[in-house]
Amino acid sequence: MNLLLTILFITTILSLILAIVSFWLPLMTPDYQKLSPYECGFDPLGSARLPFSIRFFLVAILFLLFDLEIALLLPLPWGDQLPSPMFTLLWASALLIMLTLGLIYEWLQGGLEWAEK
């Protein structure tokens, strides 16, 4: 109990000291460039309706699909503890086959080709 009170006292004092020091430190006034928004590769003061390549959008959607696939397949090692592990294997195989067929379809349609033909 004594150790708990000591740790609580030290953390409270340390937090108060850091809060007081942060108010005493001089504040820097930012200039115009630091106040303007920054987006990598885009002029923040230009038009908000810049043309956007649909290929970036397609790659982002594919990334989200495969990221979701990983999230669904991560608990599979614990699936062998279920009453019927073959059922879990069947659903995991169906998911992988469906995503593989979708990737092949996207590849054949040219959605993964970056260069214009």
From Swiss-Prot:
UniProt GO MF annotations: NADH dehydrogenase (ubiquinone) activity
Domain of life, per lineage: Eukaryota
GO cellular component terms given for this protein: mitochondrial membrane; NADH dehydrogenase complex
Keywords: Electron transport, Membrane, Mitochondrion, NAD, Respiratory chain, Translocase, Transmembrane, Transmembrane helix, Transport, Ubiquinone
Annotated catalysed reactions: a ubiquinone + NADH + 5 H(+)(in) = a ubiquinol + NAD(+) + 4 H(+)(out)
Pfam families linked: Oxidored_q4 (PF00507)
Residue ranges the record marks as coiled coil: none
Membrane topology: Multi-pass membrane protein
TM segment ranges: 3-23, 56-76, 85-105
Major localisation: mitochondrion
EC number: 7.1.1.2
Subcellular location field: Mitochondrion membrane
InterPro entries for the chain: NADH_UbQ/plastoQ_OxRdtase_su3, NDAH_ubi_oxred_su3_sf
Family: Belongs to the complex I subunit 3 family.
Primary role: Core subunit of the mitochondrial membrane respiratory chain NADH dehydrogenase (Complex I) that is believed to belong to the minimal assembly required for catalysis. Complex I functions in the transfer of electrons from NADH to the respiratory chain. The immediate electron acceptor for the enzyme is believed to be ubiquinone.
Protein name (Swiss-Prot/TrEMBL): NADH-ubiquinone oxidoreductase chain 3
Organism: Tetraodon nigroviridis
